[in-house]
Amino acid sequence: MARNSRIRITNNDKALYAKLVKNTKAKISRTKKKYGIDLSNEIELPPLESFQTREEFNKWKQKQESFTNRANQNYQFVKNKYGIVASKAKINEIAKNTKEAQRIVDEQREEIEDKPFISGGKQQGTVGQRMQILSPSQVTGISRPSDFNFDDVRSYARLRTLEEGMAEKASPDYYDRRMTQMHQNFIEIVEKSFNSDWLSDELVERLKKIPPDDFFELYLMFDEISFEYFDSEGEDVEASEAMLNKIHSYLDRYERGDVNLDLKGF
């Protein structure tokens, strides 16, 4: 295997090195002065004589050129009216993830809006009509993120929350986890509301056998499958034996395949 020969420094190398170092230092100084961001640890400025090979020098040169390139949004910054500074890359990433999270929620709402809403065993309109009366987030338990506007960010803590939250919500896995958590929470609240009762014990066992995504659709479609009627402290339980029987009847329909569930793979 051929070894890289030791670099022979030319006058052109010296001129290019001096130019790159000057541009890099100017950018570091300008960014520090204008935005209060210290980039000195982001890039190395070794002595020209320290480069052992031409390949090593060329790699360093490429890093310097990328660092000072205005198209590199990782090192282009924006300061808003509250004095919060962020790179254009971070701002664009949050905006992109916000749009994707909104798209996922919008798609989900379109999938469920025509489903029947049933209360007391009778259809009382559709899930979409219920979302108009209440709000989509009240009905589904899932909020649609607001549009991202960097000018509205008042603190770095808020910026981090948006960055992490939108990255999470832009993933379909996030909504799968929400459905799983909702399913588990409902099972637990039924257990705690009645402690031990044969009707509720049987209901719990039946609920455990339902996949989380199926449960989510049942939760949307059947009024009695609601957190509002149960209390984990056992102090304000509105769910009656008749209501438990009604939920059992809904699960009978589900187990017979009489309930149209089509959010599979959402």
Swiss-Prot record:
The keyword Hydrolase applies. GO terms for biological process: DNA replication, synthesis of primer; symbiont entry into host cell via disruption of host cell envelope; symbiont entry into host cell via disruption of host cell wall peptidoglycan; viral DNA genome replication. Keywords: Covalent protein-DNA linkage, Degradation of host cell envelope components during virus entry, Degradation of host peptidoglycans during virus entry, DNA replication, Early protein, Host nucleus, Hydrolase, Phosphoprotein, Viral DNA replication, Virion, Virus entry into host cell. GO terms for cellular component: host cell nucleus; virion component. Residues 173-266 are annotated as: Priming. A motif (Nuclear localization signal) lies at residues 25-34. It is found in: Virion; Host nucleus. Residues 74-172 are annotated as: Intermediate. GO terms for molecular function: hydrolase activity. The record marks F230 as: Positions the 3' end of the template strand at the active site of the DNA polymerase. Residues 1-73 are annotated as: Disordered. The keyword Lipoprotein does not apply. Its main location: virion. The modification O-(5'-phospho-DNA)-serine is found at S232. It comes from the Viruses. Residues 256-258 are annotated as: Interaction with the viral DNA polymerase. It holds the Pfam family Phi-29_GP3. Interacts with the viral polymerase; this interaction allows the initiation of TP-primed DNA replication at both viral DNA ends. Binds to ssDNA. Interacts with the replication protein p1. Part of a DNA-gp3-gp16 complex. Belongs to the phi29likevirus DNA terminal protein family. Acts as a primer for DNA elongation during viral genomic replication. Acts as the small terminase protein during packaging. Recruits the phage DNA polymerase to the bacterial nucleoid. Primer terminal protein (TP) is covalently linked to the 5'-ends of both strands of the genome through a phosphodiester bond between the beta-hydroxyl group of a serine residue and the 5'-phosphate of the terminal deoxyadenylate (dAMP). Hydrolyzes host peptidoglycans during virus entry. This is DNA terminal protein. It comes from Bacillus phage Nf. The gene is 3.
